[in-house]
Design a protein with these regions (language model features):
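Active-site cavity-forming subdomains of large catalytic enzyme subunits
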Residues: 34, 48, 55-122
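Short, solvent-exposed aromatic-acidic interface loops
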Residues: 87-96, 261-262, 415-422, 484
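Short, small/polar residue-rich loop motifs at catalytic or cofactor-binding pockets
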Residues: 68-70, 240-242, 395-397
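Conserved beta-alpha junction segments in alpha/beta enzyme cores
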Residues: 1-6, 226-260, 265
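Short acidic, glycine/serine/threonine-rich loops at helix termini
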Residues: 1-2, 25-31, 60-66, 86-88, ...
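Thiamine diphosphate
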Residues: 24-46, 50-52, 267-275
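A glycine- and small-aliphatic-rich helix-loop capping segment at beta-alpha/alpha-beta transitions
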Residues: 3-8, 30-41, 67, 241-243, ...
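C-terminal catalytic domains of large/alpha subunits in multi-subunit enzymes
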Residues: 8-15, 42-49, 78, 104-223, ...
Length: 548
């Protein structure tokens, strides 16, 4: 866009290099007007130009997320099995339509309203509303948190109405392992999963059975203790193809060029692990290169797709190197390609001690005499992976908290997650991704809200003094574990993980709050964010009703 439409110089003449970006969570996907202006100014002035937006600018112009009002209805049979659900959603789109603005509440979010349940019929009607606000667009989860919040709050509400515990109603309606692959009422196919076990293990890890005793301890201190759960599923890892390119260097290292760009997820570590494990090459010999338009292929980070798609491309590239290497090794050692085996970076003639290392074969491949007809010199190559289907990470979040009835303050005491991410390439990276998502989900549940003056339309939350991000004392330590079922739609068996924490957190937190206050107030629902002020107002209104 910048090269062709604004500078009119053609893409080959514009080089873009990306350093450490930091989290974007959706907002940084787009071409903001300042980007081409900075390039134009730099070209005009013939000097470096740097643009730093201030926080107020960001609040006034960057896309924001969520902002739905929904009505849900559910039909159940006499055994409390779900028969059908109808949802009408009014989705605020902002003053003008952004890139994925209409896609998020419709195709991205609405498809997840089937959840992990066997509901045979689901009807969804989404109405987009233009509002005098900044546009809404992708924010970590992009439609899936909205769907999970609506569905899981609704399931808890239904359980209370029919006289069942939240876990019992879910157990009656969750898709069972013997029903996988499961075709949802909204057109998705869950290829793998053990949803019952994930929920039960999450409850066990959270010591769900011991909650009553802990609740009594809180009551003795004058606090109201609540516990809430939420299951979730996310459709992710689809979209455009991703490519990986390998270049063997003279110092016996491999440079791997990828199109995705890390913003703190640890792509470099994960891609290195994939190639190192497949080729048997020390991780120190693999260099991941990203963020340079002159040398890296096209790609996009987003939608929890980097490892399932780009990671699968790195895996395919590794296999391609091995297969070509066998041909070269066979020619160099005067053997049949079928007699060559590969293990731990060594090509060997089966049944002999005749070997060549991967890097020796890479050097030999530069000599045309070692190449079969039609093969290009070297082991350098590329591989493109086109996603065949989405992945469906899923899990169960359990939140336990205390409410101070005198102030409305909420303190999260315990937070437990049981996730299914398929193959866990690097559990530490996965845990970091989930922790970050939970922090953002807790922020949505308890503190974060963009406020405009109703009369003037003036933005009232234009700084971090007015817009309350969750602080370290709000986000608890998280007990995280996995019960994984291998994904069948990509060769790594992985499922996307980048957005999962932000999807499961909001409903589990609000379910816990309602659980804490219901027996004291009879209140069955509170809207997010459940700030201390708003919750105190609910409690105080109930006191006044009782006193009247």
């Amino acid at each position: 866009v910048v090269a062709d439409m604004i500078l009119k110089i053609g893409q080959p003449k514009l080089r873009v290099r990306t350093g450490d970006v930091g989290g974007g969570f959706g907002m940084k996907i787009f071409v903001h007007p300042e980007y081409p202006l900075v390039v134009w100014a730099s070209r005009t002035l013939k000097r470096a130009v740097k643009w730093i937006p201030d926080r107020q600018e960001a609040f006034q112009s960057d896309v924001q997320g969520r902002d739905h009002v929904s009505l849900a209805e559910m039909a159940l049979d006499k055994d409390s099995k779900f028969l059908g659900m109808r949802v009408t959603t009014h989705a605020a789109l902002g003053a003008y339509l952004s890139h994925f603005g209409a896609f998020i509440p419709t195709m991205a979010g609405s498809g997840m309203l089937a959840g992990l349940y066997q509901t045979p019929t689901v009807y969804v009607n989404v109405k987009g509303i233009m509002t005098n606000t900044v546009p809404t667009d992708a924010y970590r989860g992009a439609g899936r948190p909205e769907a999970a919040y609506l569905l899981e709050r609704f399931v808890d509400h239904i359980a209370r109405e029919v006289g069942l515990s939240p876990d019992e109603l879910r157990k009656r309606n969750l898709v069972k392992p013997n029903q996988i692959p499961w075709n949802t009422a909204l057109g998705d196919t869950y290829d793998s999963g053990d949803f019952d076990t994930v929920m039960l293990k999450g409850m066990e890890k959270a010591d769900w059975k011991g909650f009553a005793a802990r609740k009594a301890q809180s009551a003795a201190k004058g606090k109201w203790r609540g516990i809430g759960m939420a299951t979730y599923v996310e459709k992710c890892s689809g979209g455009a193809p991703e490519s990986a390119i390998a270049k063997f260097n003279d110092d016996d290292t491999i440079s791997v060029f990828v199109g995705v760009q890390t913003n703190g997820q640890g792509h470099e570590t994960a891609f290195t692990q994939i190639m190192s494990a497949r080729l048997g090459v020390d991780a120190e010999r693999i260099r991941i290169v990203q963020g340079d338009s002159d040398v890296t292929p096209e790609g996009m980070t987003g939608g929890s797709r980097s490892i399932p798609v780009a990671g699968a491309a790195v895996l395919g590239l590794s296999d391609k190197i091995i297969e070509k290497g066998k041909l070269v090794a066979a020619s160099a050692m005067e053997a049949s390609a079928g007699d060559i085996e590969y293990k731990d970076a060594i090509f060997r003639i089966v049944g002999t001690d005749r070997t060549m290392s991967l890097f020796d074969v890479a050097k030999a491949a530069k000599d045309p005499k070692n190449l079969p007809a039609g093969e290009t010199p070297g082991l350098d190559g590329d591989f493109t992976r086109t996603p065949q289907a989405a992945t469906f990470p899923n899990g169960c979040h359990v939140c336990e908290l205390e409410v101070d009835p005198d102030t409305g303050t909420v303190e999260i005491l315990n937070y437990t997650i049981m996730d299914d991410f398929g193959t866990a390439l690097n559990p530490l990276l996965l845990q970091g991704q989930v922790h970050g998502g939970v922090g953002q989900g807790i922020g949505q549940a308890l503190t974060e809200k963009t406020i405009y003056d109703n009369d003037s339309g003036q933005l009232m939350s234009g700084s971090l003094m007015d817009y309350a991000l969750p602080r370290a004392d709000v986000v608890p330590s998280v007990k995280f574990d996995m019960h994984n079922s291998l994904c069948t739609t990509n060769p790594l068996g992985v499922k996307g993980a980048g957005e999962a924490g932000a999807i499961g957190a909001p409903p589990s937190v609000v379910n816990a709050i309602v659980n804490a206050i219901f027996e004291h107030t009879g209140v069955k629902h509170v809207d997010m964010p459940v700030t201390a002020a708003s919750l105190w107002a609910v409690i105080e209104a109930n006191r006044k009703r009782k006193a009247a």
